[in-house]
Amino acid sequence: MKNTILSFLLILFTTNAFSQENPIIYFDYVTVLNTDVEKHIEAEKNVFSKMHKEQIDMGNKIGWDMWQISNNSYGEPTTTFLYVHIQPGSGFSNEPSKIFSEYEIQEHQKQYADRIVKTGNLTLSLKGSYGIKPGQKPFNYLVTNYMVVDPYKSYEYEQMELKSAGPNYAQNGRLGWGLAKVISRFGTDHEVNYLTFDFYKSMDEILNARSTTIKFTKSQMALWRSYDKLRELKNSHIMTLIAAER
């Protein structure tokens, strides 16, 4: 597994990419032991974030974020981080680092791999956003919603989100909103095929939005039920921003 992680890290900083109109977003989920969280964050801020910033300044990528998932199960011995790589195309185009030697990079990558318990990934195509752009640093708190959509209703679902949910993003204290389609997984074993993103200023605003009980009118209830016929919410992650580079 560690060899796989090291191989991925090498690809991350050496693979060529081609340009594309819409940015591609790579999600990497990385789980570490709770006892390693502090040193993991320190390494990301002091080493890897600088490497990503260097590539951004060279024009090889649009952005990089590190998020910590806050709603892990009670008593979990691990913590999961989400890394967001925003690319102009379908891969990673990187030039050799001028701030770290090859030896330093290899040592940091080895230490990184030694901390990892498990990993996962998604490749996404950004469909649209309101209140925030890919080239802007994100707000400090994020709720990511994992949606299951009937493939035959994908267009109808996208239009509903982009024309109804997106323009009304400011409701419930949201500062920004986005929609992305999963393009790396297909088939019945991978139900989730869309993600929505709700950005907030504080954790209190997220909790307030979730604790508020709304009394729907008949028309509102009918509208929301029509939305639910297009999508099914499978999971939701509350995340705190740890680091970001643009």
Spans of model-derived segments:
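Bacterial Sec-dependent N-terminal signal peptides
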Residues: M1-N22
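Short S/T/G/P-rich N-terminal loop/turn motif that feeds into the first structured element of a domain
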Residues: S19-R246
